[in-house]
């Protein structure tokens, strides 16, 4: 079944019966991902739902923020979860979800943040489940994200996020590692940007414009929550 979280697209596969063994997952992903950004396997571990995320190239990732929102919506749509607050497991730890008029996902904590300079480009290396290189820019709409993002991605070993500060919001574009292209949205990417912006300005919530729409982030009691649009894009 296909889900889109602000244009970040995923194939979600019910693997609670272990029909697809671990060693077969990379091949399954490459053969079935099509033009989507990634594949999420729904697993059961000690009676709890586990989100097993793979990038479109078949590589495993510890976490995916928009994937977590899509995963949560999938569990709700299947009728497996009915509570307004619940948790599920991921390789980045236990993830908390709050459901009101939309889905808020508690993002993994920041395990690393440091200044980094690469080929004259200054930014921050931030890890929120997965690594990101975050850089502030001007004229983000004219930026060649495919070229510069690809160059920085291989030199930093991280996803690459460019952001511009606008009067009422931030604008973000991300080149994703493992997808190897710019995506319409990246949950851990906008979270990494929020962390950098928060530490610079003290902001506790922010609206972020991405190519796939608008995402919202807020910090409460030291925890960062993400929400945005999620919709089903196929019944398959």
From Swiss-Prot:
One of its GO terms (molecular function) is diaminopimelate epimerase activity. Substrate binds at residues 8, 55, 65-66, 159, 176-177, 187-188. It catalyses: (2S,6S)-2,6-diaminopimelate = meso-2,6-diaminopimelate. The active site is at 64 (proton donor), 186 (proton acceptor). Keywords: Amino-acid biosynthesis, Cytoplasm, Isomerase, Lysine biosynthesis. The record marks 132, 176 as: Could be important to modulate the pK values of the two catalytic cysteine residues. Its EC number is 5.1.1.7. Its main location: cytoplasm. One of its GO terms (cellular component) is cytosol. It is found in: Cytoplasm. Optimum temperature is 90 degrees Celsius. Pathway: Amino-acid biosynthesis; L-lysine biosynthesis via DAP pathway; DL-2,6-diaminopimelate from LL-2,6-diaminopimelate: step 1/1. Pfam families: DAP_epimerase. Transmembrane segments: none annotated. Optimum pH is 7.5-8.0. One of its GO terms (biological process) is lysine biosynthetic process via diaminopimelate. InterPro entries: DAP_epimerase_AS, DAP_epimerase_DapF. Probably forms homotrimers. Belongs to the diaminopimelate epimerase family. Catalyzes the stereoinversion of LL-2,6-diaminopimelate (L,L-DAP) to meso-diaminopimelate (meso-DAP), a precursor of L-lysine and an essential component of the bacterial peptidoglycan. Also catalyzes the racemization of certain amino acids, including Lys, with low efficiency. NCBIfam families: DapF. This is Diaminopimelate epimerase. The lineage of its organism: Bacteria, Thermotogati, Thermotogota, Thermotogae, Thermotogales.
């Amino acid at each position: 079944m296909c889900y889109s979280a602000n244009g970040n697209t995923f194939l979600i596969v019910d693997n609670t019966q272990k029909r697809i063994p671990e060693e077969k997952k990379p091949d399954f992903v490459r053969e079935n991902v099509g033009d989507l950004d990634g594949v999420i396997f729904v697993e059961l571990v000690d009676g709890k739902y586990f989100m097993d995320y793979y990038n479109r190239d078949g590589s495993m990732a510890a976490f995916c923020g928009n994937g977590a929102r899509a995963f949560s919506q999938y569990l709700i749509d299947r009728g497996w979860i009915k509570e307004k607050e619940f948790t599920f497991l991921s390789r980045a730890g236990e993830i908390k979800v709050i459901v009101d008029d939309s889905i808020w996902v508690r993002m993994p904590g920041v395990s690393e943040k440091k200044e980094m300079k690469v080929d004259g480009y200054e930014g921050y290396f931030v890890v929120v489940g997965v690594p990101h290189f975050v850089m502030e820019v001007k004229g983000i709409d004219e930026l060649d994200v495919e070229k510069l993002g690809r160059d920085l991605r291989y030199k930093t070993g991280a996803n690459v996020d460019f952001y511009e500060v606008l009067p009422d919001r931030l604008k973000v574009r991300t080149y994703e590692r493992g997808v190897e292209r710019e995506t319409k949205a990246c949950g851990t990417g906008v979270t990494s940007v929020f962390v950098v912006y928060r530490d610079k300005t003290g902001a506790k919530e922010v609206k972020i414009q991405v190519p796939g729409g608008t995402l919202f982030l807020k910090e409460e009691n030291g925890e960062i929550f993400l929400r945005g649009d999620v919709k089903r894009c196929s019944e398959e």
